[in-house]
């Protein structure tokens, strides 16, 4: 199902003022928290408590950005060791993860960066929380842009105490774009690696 949406997104139009190319012009890898807060002067919010992303943390978010007209929340992920900007993650709020948003975001990224260098698909399985996933990867210069689409299938309701009527008891859909430097965690130096 995700493959159909990814392939269908190729023909849609996108806005030229999308967040990804603009952010890449505005920020610098290794930049400090204070520098980000100054640069976005009031548009960025410092969180009362940091969000942990494993190898990084985010205590600054930027609201009001869009990709292909779809609103996203921007997380500036800071390196735990150096405390400098390590990665940028733009995430669609969970309640807004749907096929039109997926198509709009994919089309906008393809309008800005061309065809992905690689597309990876992850099939539904119990070990993956019954989530199907698709990932598009673009490598441009020293930057890697990765769009990740995850969706939960009906099998995810297996094991719920009261079945489907009890609502979600596991993972829900997720739609995010990660911007990273080549060679950093999760991104290899080989072009198009998922």
Model regions and ranges:
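Generic secondary-structure boundary/loop-capping signal
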Residues: 4, 21-24, 82
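Non-cytosolic coordination micro-motifs
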Residues: 15-55, 89-194
């Amino acid at each position: 199902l995700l493959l159909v949406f990814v392939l269908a997104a190729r023909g849609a139009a996108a806005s030229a003022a999308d967040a990804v190319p603009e952010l890449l012009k505005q920020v610098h890898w290794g930049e400090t928290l204070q520098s980000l807060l100054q640069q976005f002067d009031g548009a960025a919010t410092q969180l009362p408590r940091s969000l942990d992303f494993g190898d990084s943390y985010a205590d600054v978010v930027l609201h009001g950005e869009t990709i292909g007209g779809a609103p996203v929340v921007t997380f500036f992920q800071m390196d735990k060791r150096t405390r400098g900007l390590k990665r940028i993650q733009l995430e669609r709020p969970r309640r807004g993860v749907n096929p039109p948003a997926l198509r709009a975001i994919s089309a906008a990224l393809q309008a800005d960066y061309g065809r992905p260098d690689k597309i990876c698909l992850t099939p539904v399985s119990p070990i993956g929380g019954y989530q199907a996933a698709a990932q598009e990867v673009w490598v441009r210069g020293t930057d890697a842009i990765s769009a990740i689409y995850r969706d939960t299938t009906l099998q995810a309701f297996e094991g719920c105490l009261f079945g489907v009527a009890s609502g979600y008891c596991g993972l829900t859909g997720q739609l995010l774009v990660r911007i990273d430097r080549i060679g950093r965690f999760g991104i290899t130096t080989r072009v198009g690696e998922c």
